[in-house]
């Protein structure tokens, strides 16, 4: 293994090493790396400005300040290179060495390294089995520690005061026992540790103990001991005798204009260390009293602490301007630290920046570059060409010509930029499409021109956005820019494979206008034999743009006559051959145009799509201009029916108010019903308004605003509703909806109160934008960090596993068809045609359009596909498990950085959406959920998990939590399945044949009822007023409501179980189904509908639990949900899930604050699982219900870790993907599942050992899955017992910090902690990911770098190159 000094001398080329090792530096190592001892605190001489000898900038130690010149000036010039001046002792060499050469300070007394003391868990404390507080008391000279008690009464490791120590010395003599103080004591204790014996002892202790707490502590110590044993580090090296001094050019001293100096804070910190060290030396030499020496030793320890990590232990040391000094730790960590600021975030040369304007005359591969910017960027190329063409004899002349902007320069510039692509980047760079390459076109002016179709990818608009330009210099860089980054090669969005260069805004409006057809029109349209005839007629004014005509159109298989319009024939001109005319022979909206671009891509490929996009843009702009569509006040037509709808809604609200006054409904219910009434009223007004503006006789009379919204060019029905309908309900900043709507619209203007109400939402939008952008950006950073080393590394891992995918159905409607889920994926099994037994797709083949169509037509409902989650590749992912690259729809290439693409695809919409929150201006958009079930198709009714009783009206009331209604056809094939909520009413009988549109069931959206399952008399039990329930006197109605309150707060009442019992005629508790008692426990917040002694019938509602008031859901509610899922956080209120299929029973014995629920297995009646549920929580199962494995017993989101434990990896993946997709789908964002799978794969990298077998692992230890599998293979080959393990789910932050690469983890977060742990373990970073290679300055192992790496490995066999090793404490060492 090469050491760092020789590595630097060899020029440190990137091929010299393929690993970086970090370890603890011993004192000898630090001395061997040093070029001399720094003994003086001085920096430079204030008169001569030369470095002081033996000071912090000493030229003798660190090298000359001027290249090839010694300090005294005796030797100058490069010919004396290597000579050491006999007068000043300085070596004649390049001044660059001042960035590399280190010095050292010999300490008069040892000090502890603060990272190993304070970085939790403290390494020193764990090894010595002492608390941090006690170790600090010894280190900072407060107490002595007894090393050897000898004849005294002390015990080993006991802490004693100064007084006790002196008394013992007087009593027993100084040699009768050993007690020490300071870092010397700790060093003595660490040096006396026998790690091998310690490891054996700890292993036996771990096996013997049953206490979980003790076991955890033992395992923690054992792990640390084994790390020391497995590395070259020694515990005693955590105490320093020598500290390294950083090279002076890394802590510079710069002279400012006024003769003053600016200096790095490190110099002040080093100065304080040297001063205290020198003072301590002289005190020891003078044999000063112990108390003075100890105080100085303590101060030295504090000075070194401040140098390494200022403020970590004591108060922060500040400079004269009250600013804390930046220590070595501060220089590494955080956004401004060495890792993120200088290693990962380098700035680049050859770049410019300017405002962007639209360039509709450009082609897709072009951008307009101002001449001034181009001249500056391409200067070196211009100089070279001016010289080459003989226009300028020297570079100096060339420079002058360029400065004077002579005419020849512009000609040369035009030649230089010909086919030399440039990069355009728009910040924030959220995904790879934010950087694209274009061929520059020289333009006058100062703004960069951008092609309109790439705006979507850049998320750019022309309201003052700026973009930066970068120049690829080398030929290789230019080739990559042209092949990979060129805008014409980025037609598809890598997040979802949809075209991203789709027209929008004016272009859409123009194309929509062009494709319109006159209503009514002629009965017998004019027929033309060919398009040229139609053009002739149009030119003569015989037909209009939108007149219905019949025209013969030439196709590949002959001429076919279509009924169309002249406008659509214009579109035909730019339509590539092979694309059917039917695709444009309709009114084209933005969605149709997007599908059209997709169809052109599928049919004609990449090149034709680009041409078509340019053509449609030109056409769209032209006809948007010719159409004369404008935005006028009279286009905002207020519907005449508005006042009627408002009147009706007001009456409904009055009715609810009356019901509330009468006590028929609660305050919550009234609120929800009022909100619903106004929501319906707003929707009706909006519908009438849209109907009003959508009616037209001829295209010329069409409403401009309607055309804009209808085509998808600008605005939406929701926005027009606010303009010309009614603004409707507004949301408060908390997300709650204000029940008083804004009845006016923006055309009519708003009253003062209405205006005030609407300010809520508008401000919330702006505040949200500011706050959520940061959250979203941080999520993207964490995602990139966790997935950055997911790279395609092999052809096929041979896995036959995968995920089973189905169509996504919500509320009985297919939201995402199966075809979308299997698109771009590889089949894990042979897929057989059930009709003839033929193979549609073989295992390991990718689904193409034909096979997907065939699968859909055959009605196959589930397919097993290869997935990243089940890929067996050791480091990275294989091509087959990933499937197609979504940006070109071909099987993904080797070396593709799929992890970064996944992180960008998931993170980018988060940022976009949070920025987009304020566009609707805070108008409350509430998802109106279904409160009834209607038959989508005809069929025969079938019930599952039925537990029903008949109510007073003869209808069924649902008592099961998992009751479903199915509709089957005559063959028994299921066509509809829907779940009815508990307490719902069912209007059909089993076996009944129902027509389409028949109402099957309904339920209350806003309350969960508790239903009587038997008839009888109501009896309250444990219902004590003021303790378990309160009579709430409603001020506005005067009615008493009985509400169950938290009885556990009151003393002596924690044993209460507030419940309602139903008594039969004999006075005993009535029985219901399954002969269970009619006893109903009341959860917190339940409102009683019956009084003590009331007579009830089966099916009556005894009490209601009000659901939370409806709030609006948008990604601001959704983004935290996505973060929660990716961080695998435990929800505040987790739902307990069942571990088996079985029947629910309620146990009789009750605990103080919990109740026991039993699930009894369906197969084995003796097998039961018991769950404790908090008493206040509402159970969503009833006694006797059948519950499936993994289903929740109570409301709330299930815990991800529980899903993994109970249901396994596939179910966890399915749950996480569906939950994350739900949030994005709500915002209309499409992300392919494979991106989410890539992230989840990284979250499942670790496993927990359940049985160690014959390995050295410990039970409960979390290890990398690949490492465990590797060791198990070795064990199996040697006939030894393998270890068993279960998968562990880590959140993305923890997964990033626990990655194999310590460089990547340190550059992410908790830098000092990561480096401390890596140094102790002597970790080697194999440089497999992207970040660690950027930091090491090597070629990335993706794309071309992957193949270069691969060829190198094949050429040299498995490489065993050099590894550079880095020691902690600022030193660089080799081993």
Swiss-Prot record:
Needed co-factor(s): Mg(2+); Zn(2+)
Name of the coding gene: rpoC
Cofactor, how bound (note): Binds 1 Mg(2+) ion per subunit.
Protein name in the entry: DNA-directed RNA polymerase subunit beta'
Entry keyword annotation includes Nucleus: no
Biological process, per Gene Ontology: DNA-templated transcription
Catalytic activity field: RNA(n) + a ribonucleoside 5'-triphosphate = RNA(n+1) + diphosphate
GO annotations of cellular component type: DNA-directed RNA polymerase complex
Enzyme class label: transferase
Function, as annotated: DNA-dependent RNA polymerase catalyzes the transcription of DNA into RNA using the four ribonucleoside triphosphates as substrates.
Residues bound to Zn(2+) 2: 797, 871, 878, 881
Entry-linked CDD domains: RNAP_beta'_C, RNAP_beta'_N
Keywords recorded for this protein, A-Z: DNA-directed RNA polymerase, Magnesium, Metal-binding, Nucleotidyltransferase, Transcription, Transferase, Zinc
Superkingdom of origin: Bacteria
Residue positions binding Mg(2+): 461, 463, 465
UniProt EC number: 2.7.7.6
GO-annotated molecular function: DNA binding; DNA-directed RNA polymerase activity; magnesium ion binding; zinc ion binding
Subunit annotation: The RNAP catalytic core consists of 2 alpha, 1 beta, 1 beta' and 1 omega subunit. When a sigma factor is associated with the core the holoenzyme is formed, which can initiate transcription.
Entry's family note: Belongs to the RNA polymerase beta' chain family.
Binding site for Zn(2+) 1: 70, 72, 85, 88
